[in-house]
From Swiss-Prot:
It comes from Yersinia pestis. Pfam families: IMPDH. This is GMP reductase. One of its GO terms (cellular component) is GMP reductase complex. Its EC number is 1.7.1.7. GO terms for biological process: purine nucleotide metabolic process. Keywords: Metal-binding, NADP, Oxidoreductase, Potassium. Homotetramer.
Amino acid sequence: MRIEEGLKLGFKDVLIRPKRSTLKSRSEVALERQFTFKHSGWNWSGVPIIAANMDTVGTFRMAEVLASFDILTAVHKHYTLEQWAEFVKRSPESVLRHVMVSTGTSSADFDKMKQILALSPSLKFICIDVANGYSEHFVSFLQRAREACPDKVICAGNVVTGEMVEELILSGADIVKVGIGPGSVCTTRVKTGVGYPQLSAVIECADAAHGLGGQIVSDGGCSVPGDVAKAFGGGADFVMLGGMLAGHDECEGRVVEENGEKFMLFYGMSSESAMKRHVGGVAQYRAAEGKTVKLPLRGSVDNTVRDIMGGLRSACTYVGASHLKELTKRTTFIRVAEQENRVFGTD
């Protein structure tokens, strides 16, 4: 046993210090990024935000809408091959290039992933997703996927420390997914005592990834647009959002009614709700590590996406970054004891 003494920070612990700027308007800020990925060699450009691969958020409808904003969607792994075939058949290349094919790490998952990717050459992204990216089995699956799909962009995770980011990149990942426990419906930290404050994880993992020519995606912990800006400011190349995109028309959560008002259920993918839906219940040897919440219906995701992108542009304007890529170079974090004036509640 040992204790690391250094303080680790989450998004709520900091604000971004404003700096002099030559920008006259938020409209001058470009949010698009361009990447050439380490292993696949593929060039991609777009807004580096990803809808999370949760079965209520990472849906085909979400992918169709977010593609119009040049935003990615990690489509969840529970769609059947037939549903994928129907989606690919009706979708133009402009949508498919913004889709990530999510997979677990079983042999059946591998075979299904290969069948889905074979539906269209426009499907370029793979998202290998497990709760604990520190297992040897996970690394072996990643290596197998890289060998089988040399021209695909592979995003793999989740991890929170630099040495594991390096191992995943050296094993074939183009992008490493960073985050254990920060999600809005994740209870891993309270069930297991395991985790890492998200901002510090992003800063440390970005440093490790960029040294090897890889990228990271900050997954979890964002509850407002300012958190997204902090993630990019901390060095994240992509930011994955679940709760901020939940409860919209494009989601597939079950709708319930209480006292005449409708709500959509949103739950973590290790929650009892998710395991009952997909594997028949919680296995006797494990505990659920997610919760279920009821969200008021929020309409189309369009307005939420515009709000997030507007917040990002404004953050860039405050620090003089004309391109999103410059935000991390222009960011100085200050530690704070409060984030906002709550005399009239929170927005």
